[in-house]
Amino acid sequence: CYARNVHEYWGYSAGLDFEQKIIVKKNAAQLLRKFLLNPKWDATPIMLSGNTDCYQPAEKKFRLTRSLLEVCNEFNQPVGILTKNSGILRDKDLLQEMGKKNIVSAMVSITSFNEELRRMMEPRTTTAKQKLKVIEELSKSGVRMGIMMGPMIPGLNEHEMQRIMKAAADHGATFTAYTFIRLNGAIKFLFHDWLYKNFPNHADKVWHLIEQSHDGKVNDSRWGVRMRGEGSIAQMVA
């Protein structure tokens, strides 16, 4: 995940610290309420959340996402949700209420239907089949549902995109997005170790395909390009 590097700004590592040391802003709901009370705020949609999973296991204890959604609902603040976990179903009642006011949409991240690959790429996340059930249940409850496919990795999971989109649409998803893998900062070294450990027979091929999609590098920081790549490989994924 490109977001791993954010942990380094807090003095932690992008490796195990990202997975094990969770930073909690316990007064998030109070801060959001204060922000929304600003008369100059124009109710531009906000996102939960681009750099973490707002329904990660810690949410069961802290309920920050629930409290933030309650504030958004109170102020009729439009919000989008991105998650890899079925924990979002806990808040179905609230999301259904927000859906009636057309102020919420949710994206479920699906990267593969290959369970072995999913466990290696995203341990402790919900299975693809469970995610499809989440899409179906929430869409039937009036929540606008979509999917995020990311990261798409050439030579590993990019060939599944059409199948994922079809399955998601069959379960009620109405929009889709994707991100092409980018190995920024420390993630370059973490991914390299993971790739060659788990896929020694074709790791070189995957690595070179990524390089071909980022102008000979494995990362591109240019806005508008970094998340989609460029060149023939990236175009085939798109």
Regions found by a protein language model. Give the residues of each.
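Conserved Radical SAM active-site core
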Residues: 2-107, 111-119, 128-140
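Residues that form generic nucleotide/phosphate-binding pockets
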Residues: 31, 35, 98, 120, ...
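Active-site glycine- and acidic-residue-rich loops that bind
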Residues: 86-89, 153-162
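Conserved strand-turn element in the central/C-terminal portion of the radical SAM core barrel
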Residues: 113-115, 121-124, 137-157, 181-183, ...
